[in-house]
Amino acid sequence: MKNRRVGLWLIGAWGGVSATAVLGLAAWKRNLTDGTSMVTMLPLFDALDLDGPDAFVVGGHDIRQSSFVDAVQDLHRRSNVFDASLIDACKPQLEEWGANVRPGTILNAGAAIAKLADNPEANLADTPRAVIERIQADLQKFKADNKLDQVLVLNVSSTEPPFAIGESHQSMPKFLRALEARQNMIPASSMYAWAAIDLGMPYINFTPSLGASFVAALELVQERKTVTGGKDGKTGETLMKSVLAPMFALRNFRILSWVGHNIFGNRDGLVLDDPANKESKIRTKDQLIQQIVGYKPQTHVSIEYIESLDDWKTAWDHIHFQGFLGTKMIMQFIWQGCDSILAAPLVLDIARLTLFAHRRGEVGVLRQLACFFKSPMGVEEHDFFEQFRMLEEYVRAV
C-alpha cells in the first residue's frame, strides 16, 4: 500500500543503536545511503510488501534529556562514525522525529540504569500500573497525531539486571490481580511490553531484559492478536559463535573449551560494568555452544568496560579443540566493530518484518526472526544457518 504510514517507537530513543537506526532511516529516505548490512535488502525479500523509508514515523521513550541530533553528533565526535555532512543533511528529519520522544521510566530498571536518568519525569509514577497507563497514553497520542496505520514498539534500551518471575507471572488473571494490587512485580522493560501488547501493538525486545518473555505477557499477545519477538540482538561475537560452532560440529572436531573476552566503552558498556546487569548479558552470550554441538565444553564469557573505546567493541575468542588421533589444536579470532553500526540495520530489518507479519494477521512469537537474536523466543535452535533457513522458508511460504 503506497500511502501506508507506520510508527517505529524506540525504547531508549537517545541511545547509540536507536539514534544510528534513525539516522540510517532518514538517510535512506533521502537516497543518501544504500542497503548494505540490511538483510531485508537482499533479493530474497523483493517480493514482500515491506515498508520503505517513506512510510515510517519515529518516536520513543528515554530517561535522559537529549535529541537524535545530539546523539548522532556525540557518536560522530567520540567514535568517528558517520560523515558530518550526512548528519547535516538529515538534521531536519531527526529534529521532526525527535519531537515525538517522551520521558521513559526508571521504575524497577535497576540502579545502574537509574543513574543515567537526568529527566525528572522518568521517576514520576510509583507503580507499574501508573507507568503502563502513561506509556499507553504516549503511544495512543503518537498514533493519533501522526495518523498511523500501525505502531511497533521496539526495545533498544540498556540491559536490566535479571528479574525473577514468580506465580503472578504465570497467567493473565494472576498478573492482572497483582497489577491491581499495586505490586512491583515487573521491570521497566516488561511495563513497556505490556503497555504495547495491551493496545494490540507489536513489541520486539532487542535487549536481554525480561520484556514480554513470561507466560502472562504471551497470553496477552494471543488475547490481543498481536506479535512479539526477541531477545538480545545478535550482532558481533555471538554471531561469530553461531556461524563457527556448526563448522566444528559438522567436521566432528571436539571443542574442549571456548573462551570469549569482550571489551567496549559505550553507555551500554558502562551499564554492563554493574555485575547484576552483566549477568543478564552473559546468560544470553554463553548458551549457544552447547546447543549447537550437543555436549558441554568448558566455556567462559567476560565483558569489561573500557571507557576509551567508546562505541567500538573488540571480542577475542580462544577455541581449544581436539582433532584426529587425539591432537589438540587452537583457533583464535578477533572481532572488532562499531556496536551501533552493527545493530542499527538489524533494528530496521526487524521493524520491517514485524510490521509485515502484523499486517498479515499473524499472532504470537515471530519464530522466523530467530537469526537476529542471541536468545530467540520460541526457538531452541542457535545454528545461524538453520535459523536463517527458517526465515527463508517463511518468506517463500508467504
Give, region by region, the residue ranges found by the protein language model.
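An acidic- and aromatic-residue-enriched active-site/binding cleft used to recognize and process polar
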Residues: 13, 156-158, 208-211, 233-234, ...
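Conserved anion/nucleotide-ligand pocket segment
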Residues: 229-231, 235-299
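Acidic, His- and aromatic-enriched active-site or binding-groove loops in soluble protein domains
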Residues: 177-184, 224-237
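Glycine- and other small-residue-rich loops at beta-strand/loop junctions that grip anionic moieties
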Residues: 185, 206-209, 231-233, 258, ...
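Glycine-rich, aromatic-lined ligand/substrate-binding cores of catalytic
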Residues: 297-304, 308-365
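Glycine-rich beta-alpha junction loops
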Residues: 14, 62-65, 235-236, 259-266, ...
